[in-house]
Amino acid sequence: MSHAVEKIAVFFETLTPQSIERFSQFYTEDAYFKDPFNEVRGIPAIQRIFRHMYETLDEPHFVVTGRVVEGEQVLLTWDFHFRFRNFKSNELQTIRGATHLRLAHDGRIRSHRDYWDAAEELYEKLPVVGGLMRWLKQRANR
């Protein structure tokens, strides 16, 4: 399985809009995907999520920072770098997160679940919403 995990990590680190078409090499047909905004099943639905990423963000890319493999289960930690396309700030953004994968016997992904803090890692960086989120966080910590 470690060879399959290495291929998966390299695939995500080198992901492009064109390589999304190769998802069937890495996901089973009925693969499950969940992140803070989406919960879908099947390659076409997963491809739509990644296409949307490229349509709405500039320079999105993943850097895998760690991996733990236990049988068919994999935990990848990563940094996701991007620039907001529709905001004045052109500053490079980073979201830190983790992905729990469950692999099929052939090494393809049958379950992909992303974990990251949408409030801290995304909402707090948005104009208007970010100020509100930071204020709410301060109030909650009093």
Q: Locations of the language-model features?
A:
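A solvent-exposed, acidic/Ser-Thr-rich amphipathic alpha-helical stretch
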Residues: E21-R22, T28-Q73
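A generic structural signal for ordered secondary structure
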Residues: V10-F11, F23, F50, Q93-T99
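A beta-strand edge to alpha-helix "cap/lid" segment located at domain peripheries
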Residues: E55-H61, T65-R142
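Short, charged low-complexity linear motifs
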Residues: K7-T14, P36, V64, G97
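Soluble or luminal CAZymes and related metallo-dependent hydrolases
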Residues: H3, K7, A45, Q93
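Short, mixed-charge, low-aromatic patches
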Residues: M1-V10, D35-P36, Y54-D58, R110
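Short acidic-aromatic low-complexity motifs
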Residues: S2-F26
